[in-house]
Regions:
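Bacterial Sec-dependent N-terminal signal peptides
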Residues: 1-42
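Extended repeat-based scaffolds of very large eukaryotic assembly and lipid-transport proteins
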Residues: 34-261, 265, 269-294
Length: 390
C-alpha cells in the first residue's frame, strides 16, 4: 500500500503537508493497540439499498484511551455503475473528525480520463473532507449529475468516456469550489463517509470509554474540539458534574466564539451556586478577548440581584481591558448604584492609563461618586490636566 502510517498519502513519492503530520501526532501511531468492530453503513450512492458491512478499527494509546479510527473503503462513486471504484483507507481522530486517507499501491484516486490525482488534488480533497460544514451536506449525488456535459472529446466513444468520475455530467456551479475538479462524485462520496453516518458511531464508541482520567486527558490537550466534546458530554449528565469547573474555566481564554457560550453554560450548570459561577467567570476576564469578555459581562448584567462582592470583583478585573469592556463594566456598576472603597481604589488606577478614553470614562464614573480625600485629589488633578479635552 502506498502510504506512510496514518498520514495523508498522495503518491508513493508524495509530498506530505507538514501541518497534517503535526496534527496527527498524538492521535494515531503505528504502535497503538487496536480493536475491530463490524458496523453497517448506508451506501451514499444507493441509500435505499440495504446497509453494507464495514470493518471499523479503533486505536488506543499507551494509556488505554481511544486515539482514533480507520476504515477500509471500496465503493462506487456514480449512479450508472461504470465509474472506477474508489479504494482507500480513511482515518479519523477519537472524536470522529476526519484526519487523512491512503490508497493501495498502484491505485491512486483518479479523475477525468483515469488521470491520477496530483498532490494539489489530494491537498484540496484533504481540506474538503475536513470541512464538516461543506455545501456537500446539502446535496445528493444526483445533484452533481443534474447537467449534461459537453460532447465527448473527438475520437472518444461516449460510453468509454463516461467510465471516469465527473465526465458524463457537468458539475453544477454551486458546488464547483467544494469538490476536486473533474472528481466531483469521488469527492462527494468520500465526504459523506468522512462526515455523516459514521461520525456518531465513532463518537458513541469513544464515549463508551469515558472515565475521569480519559476526560481529563481530553481537557489537558487544550484542543477546544476535544474540550467541547467533553463539555457536551458533561452537560448531558444529571446532575452536571462539578469536578471540572477549574479546568474548563482555565481553558476559557483559548475558546473561540464557537465555544465560549458552551463553556459559560457548563460553569452555570455545574457550579453549586451562582456566585461560584460568577467568581470563576470574572477570574477569566483579564485573559479573555473582547467578544468573550463582553459575553461574561452581559451574563452578569442579566442578573438583577448581583451581590456587592461580585461587583467589587468585576471592578478589580477590568484594569487591562479595552475601552468598550471597561465601559460595560462601569455601566453595570453604575446601574446597581453601589460604590465601595475597593471599587474606588480599582477605578482610580484607570486615571493613570495611557488610553485617554479609558481614563476619561473612569473620570466620569468617579465624578458621580462620594470619594475619599485622596481619590478626590487624584480626580481633580486629572480634570485640571485634561480640562481642554473633557
Amino acid at each position: 500500500m502506498s502510504k506512510l502510517p496514518f498520514l495523508p498519502v498522495f503518491q508513493s513519492t508524495a509530498w506530505i503537508p507538514l501541518l497534517s503530520i503535526c496534527f496527527l501526532i498524538g492521535w494515531l501511531s503505528p504502535v497503538d493497540a487496536k480493536e475491530t468492530t463490524i458496523i453497517q453503513l448506508t451506501d451514499p450512492v444507493y441509500p435505499k439499498k440495504p446497509k453494507k458491512e464495514h470493518s471499523l478499527t479503533a486505536y488506543f494509546n499507551d494509556e488505554g484511551f481511544p486515539s482514533g479510527y480507520s476504515m477500509e473503503l471500496i465503493n462506487e462513486v456514480c449512479l450508472d455503475g461504470v465509474c472506477k471504484l474508489v479504494e482507500v483507507t480513511m482515518y479519523w481522530d477519537a472524536l470522529g473528525f476526519y484526519q487523512s486517507l491512503e490508497y493501495p499501491e498502484g491505485k491512486p484516486l483518479t479523475k477525468v480520463e483515469h488521470e491520477p490525482f496530483v498532490p494539489a488534488d489530494y491537498e484540496k480533497l484533504d481540506s474538503i473532507l475536513k470541512d464538516r460544514e461543506s455545501i456537500l451536506d446539502d446535496h445528493e449525488l444526483g445533484f452533481l449529475a443534474s447537467e449534461k456535459d459537453d460532447k465527448s472529446p473527438e475520437g472518444e466513444d461516449d460510453d468509454e468516456y463516461q467510465e471516469v468520475d465527473g465526465v458524463s455530467k457537468a458539475t453544477p456551479g454551486a458546488v464547483k469550489e467544494a469538490v476536486v475538479k473533474d472528481a466531483a462524485w469521488t469527492t462527494w462520496v468520500l465526504w459523506k463517509y468522512a462526515n455523516t453516518e459514521l461520525v456518531p458511531i465513532m463518537q458513541r464508541m469513544t464515549k463508551s470509554q469515558f472515565s475521569p482520567d480519559f476526560l481529563m486527558h481530553l481537557l489537558d490537550s487544550k484542543d477546544w474540539r476535544r474540550v467541547a466534546f467533553v463539555i457536551n458530554h458533561l452537560l448531558g449528565q444529571k446532575p452536571v458534574a462539578p469536578q471540572y469547573l477549574d479546568e474548563i474555566a482555565a481553558l476559557m481564554p483559548l475558546a473561540g466564539i464557537d465555544h465560549i457560550e458552551l463553556a459559560i453554560e457548563y460553569l452555570r450548570k455545574a457550579s453549586p451556586d451562582k456566585n461560584t459561577c460568577y467568581r470563576k467567570l470574572i477570574g477569566t476576564l483579564p485573559e479573555l478577548n473582547g467578544y468573550n469578555a463582553a459575553l461574561v459581562i452581559e451574563l452578569l448584567e442579566s442578573d438583577g440581584q448581583l451581590e456587592n462582592e461580585i461587583l467589587e470583583r468585576l471592578a478589580a478585573s477590568i484594569g487591562n481591558q479595552e475601552y468598550y469592556l471597561i465601559h460595560l463594566a462601569l455601566r453595570l456598576i453604575e446601574g446597581r448604584e453601589f460604590f465601595s472603597n475597593a471599587i474606588e481604589a480599582d477605578i482610580v488606577k484607570l486615571l493613570e492609563v495611557q488610553d485617554f478614553f479609558i481614563a476619561r470614562r473612569a473620570s466620569d464614573f468617579l465624578s458621580n461618586q462620594k470619594l475619599s480625600a485622596s481619590a478626590k485629589e487624584k480626580l481633580d488633578a486629572f480634570r485640571v490636566k485634561h480640562a481642554d479635552r473633557l
